[in-house]
Amino acid sequence: MKRLTLLTLACIFFINVQARAEITPQLMQEWSRQPSNVQWDLYYQRTNIQVVDTLPWVSPSLADTWAYTTMNVQNGYVQSVDMVIKRGYESALTHEVGHALSNAGYTPYWWCYQPCFIQIWQAERYNNVMMAQGFDDIREYFACAYDMYIRYPQVLKRANPMTYNYIIVCLQNT
């Protein structure tokens, strides 16, 4: 609770500092579309706890990376958490965690855009019928591969061995 209070105070300070900045009509429009930083922070903390409690294979650090990289960019994170917690659609969540893992490798490229992974994707993308939606988009392929790694590791290892090994390397280095 103490940590959350300090975090909330830090967010309030950040909001006050932002209020002193030049407020443009574009900035006002952007703020009106998004919850306040405090609301985001509380939602972010609660959601990460729900993800880790619901799916024990998601480490707190990966859940944190996932929420941080996807929450403000796309609605998939919010929708997939809702689907998993309320409806039990675990594959939607593992797919979104796969996107977060692909975004975690900031060594000149995300994991899914590393030159070696592009070669793996070109070689193996048509090997696995279960990953059909990932054929043409490298980010979708990576997310589908992570989902397969979690739910059907032996199928992925047989059909896409280089992808399987690459996912292991990404997890070890994230």
What are these regions (language model features)?
Residues 4-13:
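Sec-dependent N-terminal signal peptides
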Residues 9, 23, 27-31, 66-73, ...:
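Extended hydrophobic/Leu-rich segments
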Residues 17-21:
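Boundary at the C-terminal end of the N-terminal hydrophobic targeting segment
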Residues 23-48:
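Zn2+-dependent metallopeptidase catalytic core
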Residues 42-174:
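Active-site-flanking segments in enzyme catalytic domains
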